[in-house]
From Swiss-Prot:
Pfam families: Ribosomal_S5, Ribosomal_S5_C. With S4 and S12 plays an important role in translational accuracy. Located at the back of the 30S subunit body where it stabilizes the conformation of the head with respect to the body. The gene is rpsE. It comes from Bifidobacterium adolescentis (strain ATCC 15703 / DSM 20083 / NCTC 11814 / E194a). Residues 1-53 are annotated as: Disordered. One of its GO terms (biological process) is translation. Keywords: Ribonucleoprotein, Ribosomal protein, RNA-binding, rRNA-binding. Residues 55-118 form the S5 DRBM domain. One of its GO terms (molecular function) is rRNA binding. This is Small ribosomal subunit protein uS5. Residues 11-22 have a biased composition (Low complexity).
């Protein structure tokens, strides 16, 4: 074997060794990345599951609907569902299916699509408000701490899911659950923060809101901040585990 052939053989062996080493390194990196993505995915799934577990849901009513065809009648169910986090976010949904569990599940999904934030001050509404829907009318008034939710079943379900613990309510007109719930949602959507009212009227915050309301609001903000910090600390501890 000549010297040139020997040099060529050595060069080929060196290239093959380098290629094998590079492929092994890439395999290790890909496996490491997959493990990392798996751990991150598991943490993300745990956070989503914990968020789902924190949600409150109330089935207000389930109606049986009958439809007549040539060959007879078919029955289905319609569920009115309220979903909220108990911390100021709530939504109402309506689901239909031939089975009750499926109707409730559809109602929950519909409610989550229509969630909104409710202004609160220390567990109560910010000001008196009236909501309307069809022939139903619902009145909401602020209440002192410890009063509780003075409301009927349909209005109570919305208040509990929205995180309102003290409120005075009155339902007038239609007693149909759908109308009452939608009137309650209309009232909650009309609520405003004191800053919004002051800006709209061109007045200062002290002129619009009484001192007791401002003190309660400051205390509520401090309590909410403390609860949020505790929740973040617990979440960080779980992720570390």
């Amino acid at each position: 074997m000549s010297d040139n052939e020997k040099e060529t053989q050595v060069a080929e062996e060196t290239q093959n060794t380098q290629a094998a080493a590079e492929s092994n390194n890439e395999d290790r990196k890909s496996r490491r990345g997959q493990r990392g993505e798996g751990r991150r995915g598991e943490r993300r799934n745990r956070r989503e599951e914990s968020h789902e577990n924190e949600m409150l849901d109330r089935v207000v009513t389930i109606n049986r609907v009958s439809k007549t065809h040539k060959g007879g009648r078919t029955f289905s169910f319609a569920a009115l569902v309220v979903v909220g986090d108990g911390k100021g976010t709530v939504g109402v949904g309506y689901g239909k299916s031939r089975e009750v569990p499926a109707a409730i599940a559809k109602g929950q999904l519909d409610a989550k699509k229509h969630m909104f934030t409710v202004p609160r001050i220390k567990g109560t509404v910010t000001h008196p408000v009236i909501g309307h829907d069809a022939a139903g009318t619902v009145l909401l008034r602020p209440a002192a701490p410890g009063t509780g939710v003075i409301a009927g079943g349909a209005v109570r379900a919305v208040m509990e899911c929205a995180g309102i613990t003290d409120v005075l309510t009155k339902s007038m007109g239609s007693a149909t659950a759908v109308n009452v719930v939608r009137a309650t949602v209309d009232a909650l959507k009309k609520l405003e923060e004191p800053e919004e009212i002051a800006a709209r009227r061109g007045m200062s915050l002290e002129e619009v809101a009484p001192d007791a309301l401002l003190r309660a609001r400051a205390e509520g903000i401090a309590e909410a901040r403390k609860a949020r910090e505790e929740a973040q600390a617990k979440a960080a501890q779980k992720d570390g585990e």
